[in-house]
């Protein structure tokens, strides 16, 4: 891939060698994160984000971050209607994509012993908000009602291009849970 002189200058200012591999850092002994983070996975319904093909991506499906005082923050990356192999499911069917997206987020939460009652915020990206917002709001309201959510999470809806043209909706979420909660697989109790 070709880099411009300006791009190389910015990379060098960050201590990244423009000619080296993507992970090459010229500053040995760089500090680690001050707060431990653990990747969240739900392989029964979602592939690892880094396994997308044909293009590689650089993000995690979610992170588990201890906040102290027995609280844990779950940050779930934008999630859409994809299967365990990373393939889009329900192309062209907004409502079915919305239900699959909610299913995928539910499995990510369950992998950490969390539920939708732990969600404090969502950000919802809709490809065509004028066309699909009615269906979006109907499905979300039906789901939240079925889950018994009261209060409902804080939320923002944004019209946005999503990473693939056949994906019509993507949702990211933030949850807070108590450390050691029943069901938190492999976590401190």
Regions found by a protein language model. Name each.
Residues 1-103, 107-120, 126-189:
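N-terminal presequence-like segments and the immediate start of the first folded domain
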């Amino acid at each position: 891939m070709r880099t411009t002189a300006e791009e190389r200058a910015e990379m060098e200012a960050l201590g990244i060698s423009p000619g080296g591999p993507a992970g090459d850092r010229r500053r040995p002994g760089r500090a680690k994160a001050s707060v431990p983070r653990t990747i969240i996975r739900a392989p029964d319904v979602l592939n690892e984000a880094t396994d997308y093909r044909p293009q590689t991506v650089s993000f995690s499906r979610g992170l588990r971050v201890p906040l102290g005082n027995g609280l844990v923050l779950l940050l779930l990356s934008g999630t859409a209607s994809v299967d365990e192999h990373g393939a889009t499911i329900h192309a062209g069917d907004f409502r079915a994509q919305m239900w699959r997206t909610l299913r995928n987020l539910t499995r990510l939460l369950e992998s950490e012993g969390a539920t939708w009652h732990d969600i404090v915020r969502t950000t919802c990206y809709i490809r065509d908000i004028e066309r699909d917002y009615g269906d979006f709001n109907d499905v979300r309201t039906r789901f939240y009602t079925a889950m018994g959510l009261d209060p409902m999470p804080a939320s923002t809806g944004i019209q946005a291009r999503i990473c693939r043209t056949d994906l019509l909706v993507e949702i990211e979420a933030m949850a807070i849970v108590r450390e050691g909660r029943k069901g938190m697989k492999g976590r401190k109790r």
